[in-house]
From Swiss-Prot:
Positions of transmembrane segments: none
Effect on the protein upon substituting residue 98 to C: Found in hematological malignancies; uncertain significance; somatic mutation; loss of NF-kappa-B complex activation; loss of interaction with IRAK4; reduces homooligomerization
Protein name stated in the entry: Myeloid differentiation primary response protein MyD88
Region: Intermediate domain, residue numbers: 110-155
InterPro entries: DEATH-like_dom_sf, Death_dom, MyD88_Death, Myelin_different_resp_MyD88, TIR_dom, Toll_tir_struct_dom_sf
CDD domains per record: Death_MyD88
GO molecular function, one term: TIR domain binding
Lineage summary: Eukaryota, Metazoa, Chordata, Craniata, Vertebrata
Annotated PANTHER family: MYD88, MYELOID DIFFERENTIATION PRIMARY RESPONSE PROTEIN MYD88
Phenotype for residue 209 to R: Found in hematological malignancies; uncertain significance; somatic mutation; constitutively activates NF-kappaB complex activation
Effect of residue 93 to P: In IMD68; results in a loss of function; loss of NF-kappa-B complex activation
Species the sequence originates in: Homo sapiens
Reported tissue expression: Ubiquitous.
Length: 296
């Protein structure tokens, strides 16, 4: 049975941060929530009970049951709905008697909320001052408010990812294998794959910049002969490198998954490569990649 009484939820974030959007919670907190709620037991409310409290319908819950991380997918789907917030999530966990979750994750949730507020304040402070007449003539980038399948159309709760995948259409089969190995296993990583996650109809350059810089913690580059001919991949790679000069933040991870006739790109030679073609290290490939993407 869930531990604690009425005061057990005292470790939860204070009311000043509870109205924040669910996007304030980072991947570490979401994974720990999954560890608590993915387990189906008879003595504690699990993710299905939470989904019902969030007003998900029966068929929607059945669809979530097919996912490797149903709690994570539930949070992703819920954060785009009206009324979804950190405070509401805590209220539902309290209602379900999951005081153990509140006690264990309360400090981490509070930390995430404070970081989110600080980042919002910094972004607001860095905005250039403009004359009202001039500002009114500048087109607003509303297109970036709803660019992925689980985005909030108003831009209040943008979808976030562990990694952006830079690839050519001809390499899509390897990208699909990457999805199976990293998303549908115990790693439970969340990848941004353009053909799957990005909505059609907007500028590819603007979308790539937004996702790489603001939505994804890292970028995986699937290097192949076709990659070398892609202007889109070239732009994405150079943009990611510009955000982390010298690769000090380990932001970009190159992958070589098949033999190449052309020379490996010189711009990536100074970064450690994940080599899927080496039979001696192939058994360690997915573990190394998953750990690299899981770093804070």
């Amino acid at each position: 049975m869930a531990a604690g009484g009425p005061g057990a939820g005292s470790a939860a974030p204070v009311s000043s941060t509870s109205s924040l959007p669910l996007a304030a919670l980072n991947m570490r907190v979401r994974r720990r929530l999954s560890l608590f709620l993915n387990v189906r037991t008879q003595v504690a409310a699990d993710w299905t009970a939470l989904a019902e409290e969030m007003d998900f319908e029966y068929l929607e819950i059945r669809q979530l049951e097919t996912q490797a991380d149903p709690t994570g997918r539930l949070l992703d789907a819920w954060q785009g709905r009206p009324g979804a917030s950190v405070g509401r999530l805590l209220e539902l966990l309290t209602k379900l008697g999951r005081d153990d979750v509140l006690l264990e994750l309360g400090p981490s949730i509070e930390e995430d909320c404070q970081k989110y507020i600080l980042k919002q304040q910094q972004e607001e402070a860095e905005k250039p001052l403009q004359v009202a007449a001039v500002d009114s003539s500048v087109p607003r980038t509303a297109e970036l408010a709803g660019i992925t399948t689980l985005d909030d159309p108003l831009g209040h709760m943008p979808e976030r990812f562990d990694a952006f995948i830079c690839y050519c259409p001809s390499d899509i089969q390897f990208v699909q294998e990457m999805i199976r190995q990293l998303e549908q296993t115990n790693y439970r990583l969340k990848l941004c794959v353009s053909d799957r996650d990005v909505l059609p109809g907007t500028c590819v350059w603007s979308i790539a910049s937004e996702l790489i810089e603001k939505r994804c913690r890292r970028m995986v580059v699937v290097v192949s002969d076709d990659y070398l001919q892609s202007k889109e991949c070239d732009f994405q790679t150079k943009f990611a490198l510009s955000l982390s000069p010298g690769a000090h933040q380990k932001r970009l991870i190159p992958i070589k998954y098949k033999a190449m006739k052309k020379e490996f790109p010189s711009i990536l030679r100074f970064i450690t490569v994940c080599d899927y073609t080496n039979p001696c290290t192939k058994s360690w490939f997915w573990t190394r990649l998953a750990k690299a993407l899981s770093l804070p």
